[in-house]
Amino acid sequence: IFFQETNTPQIDLHQLLNAIDGAKNDNKILGIFIDLSDFLGGYPAELLKVTNQLEDFKLSGKFIIAYSDFFSQSAYVIASPSTEIISYPSGGVLLQGFSSKRLFFKDFFDKIGLEVINLSEGQFKTAFENLTLSSMSDDDKNQRLNLFSNIWKEITKVIERNRELNQGSIDYYLNNIDQILEKNGGDWGRASVEYKLIDSLVKRGDLEKY
């Protein structure tokens, strides 16, 4: 789990999960406030583990409030189980889906006279293709598409369940963000509230009053 600010300590996943579980069983703790403004993200499996733990915490009847100046996709996955999600007035939620890129070195190796021999057999033996090809093979494209499509389906399912959104709402938001922003005068925050991704827009200085 990574944070942007250098003075923010990186959090061990297991320590975080244990802390949430401990807070659930501590009668002195009424709820959790999560500031995700400097959150850089983590692997999807890690994000889902934290989300699942927060969902379990919420079942205890305690509140969860999540805040961010602007929610990245990773931050929003973690925020999704919250009782209330708050963003800065000029903030909002940025959802992008997943993508994959590779650097290919064959053309460079050809220029310097270096030949790479890849000994492999069968389909989907693509680990060294970036050394022997100039672009991504169909096998590699297909396996990456299948992988990221399945991950994205799980992510959207979790968000839609936690936010009580209709199935397909997240894909609609992502695929139509240009029209959604135009409808809301280019205001990410207002668009995010309209589509029930966040609940309130509050300045950081007003959070305590809120």
Enumerate the predicted regions with their spans.
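Peri-catalytic and regulatory segments of divalent metal-dependent proteins
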Residues: L181
